[in-house]
């Protein structure tokens, strides 16, 4: 995996000081931390054709098409993309191959986009970006540069596969890092953290880490699980929540607003609440394991299988002074 293009891209940008540490960090990752299946995933990416779409739409979805592809080529693309399963965040429509992902991430984007500052010309960080679906939508909304970070290596390969099929667009780059591995860059106009906070053992530390990536006046877009309760309530689940082990703190939206203000954010707004439905998160032919339907109480879908409130998500927007 070659990150040279990204290094060259940021060399003359406000992110240039990241080059003091990042190349050595990623070289160490490639030497010491590769997943056992990484070579197989990387090979699938390598075998994919580098295509220049005749039609490309990142504004209303992530779709690309070309009249030049034969049915055999299309089938070959689908086979290689299926080698990168499971596909969790999407959907993608690529030359007649429709990747029906576990999550309808476009629905989340539709809930978020009306409430945030215009991304036109902005440098954006997407923390916990998955395979990068929202990164492409951020470009579609006018972002100048989008950097995604996610330590899951399958997501990196899925992202690079998409890049090959979307015309080798170099305005978006995914790095296999967690937020705690970033220096205090203070260089991003907008930082997104969507579906991450409840996985963090120390949520206030996470909020400070996000703040440290923003320029003064920059905007945080935070999307996470919440509970329907007063401003002082926080759920601390037992061993599992909706069958997930690594869930630590689920505050009410009001409590989360208080946390953001305690961390020094201003103009904190709760802009959306939405229950996750089994239409938004479900098993598909591109993600064949259990999904939300199996994680809810079969007799009472307002509760998880463990008896906690079913997943409710909120979007908050805040500003770094």
Swiss-Prot record:
It catalyses: carboxy-S-adenosyl-L-methionine + 5-hydroxyuridine(34) in tRNA = 5-carboxymethoxyuridine(34) in tRNA + S-adenosyl-L-homocysteine + H(+). CDD domains: AdoMet_MTases. It is an enzyme of class 2 (transferase). GO terms for molecular function: methyltransferase activity; transferase activity, transferring alkyl or aryl (other than methyl) groups. One of its GO terms (biological process) is tRNA wobble uridine modification. Carboxy-S-adenosyl-L-methionine binds at residues 89, 103, 108, 128, 179-180, 194, 198, 313. Pfam families: Methyltransf_9. Keywords: Transferase, tRNA processing. The keyword Ubl conjugation does not apply. Signal peptide: none annotated. Its EC number is 2.5.1.-. HAMAP family: tRNA_carboxymethyltr_CmoB. Homotetramer. Belongs to the class I-like SAM-binding methyltransferase superfamily. CmoB family. Catalyzes carboxymethyl transfer from carboxy-S-adenosyl-L-methionine (Cx-SAM) to 5-hydroxyuridine (ho5U) to form 5-carboxymethoxyuridine (cmo5U) at position 34 in tRNAs. This is tRNA U34 carboxymethyltransferase. It comes from Erwinia tasmaniensis (strain DSM 17950 / CFBP 7177 / CIP 109463 / NCPPB 4357 / Et1/99).
């Amino acid at each position: 995996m070659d990150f040279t293009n990204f290094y060259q891209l940021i060399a003359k940008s406000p992110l240039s000081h990241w080059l003091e540490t990042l190349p050595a960090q990623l070289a160490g990752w490639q030497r010491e931390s590769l997943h056992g299946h990484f070579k197989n995933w990387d090979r699938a990416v390598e075998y994919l054709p580098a295509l220049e779409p005749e039609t490309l739409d990142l504004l209303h979805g992530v779709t690309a098409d070309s009249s030049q592809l034969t049915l055999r080529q299309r089938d070959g693309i689908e086979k290689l993309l299926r080698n990168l399963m499971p596909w969790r965040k999407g959907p993608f429509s690529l030359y007649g191959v429709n990747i029906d992902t576990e999550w309808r991430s476009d629905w989340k984007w539709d809930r978020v986009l009306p409430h945030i500052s215009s991304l036109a010309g902005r440098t954006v960080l997407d923390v916990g970006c998955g395979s990068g679906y929202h990164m492409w939508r951020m470009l579609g909304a006018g972002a100048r540069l989008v950097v995604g970070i996610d330590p899951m290596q399958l997501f990196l390969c899925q992202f690079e596969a998409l890049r090959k099929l979307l015309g080798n667009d170099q305005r978006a780059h995914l790095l296999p890092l967690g937020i705690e591995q970033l220096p205090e860059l203070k260089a991003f106009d907008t930082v997104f953290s969507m579906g991450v906070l409840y996985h963090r053992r120390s949520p206030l530390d996470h909020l400070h880490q996000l703040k440290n990536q923003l320029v003064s006046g920059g905007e945080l877009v935070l999307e996470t699980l919440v509970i329907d309760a007063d401003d002082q309530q926080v759920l601390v689940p037992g061993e599992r929540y909706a069958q997930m082990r690594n869930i630590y703190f689920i505050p009410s939206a009001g409590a989360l607003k208080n946390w953001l203000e305690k961390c020094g954010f201003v103009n904190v707004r709760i802009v959306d609440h939405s229950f996750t439905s089994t239409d938004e998160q479900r098993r598909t032919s591109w993600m064949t394991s259990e999904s939300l339907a199996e994680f809810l109480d079969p007799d009472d879908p307002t509760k998880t299988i463990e008896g906690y409130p079913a997943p409710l998500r909120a979007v908050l927007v805040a500003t770094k002074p």
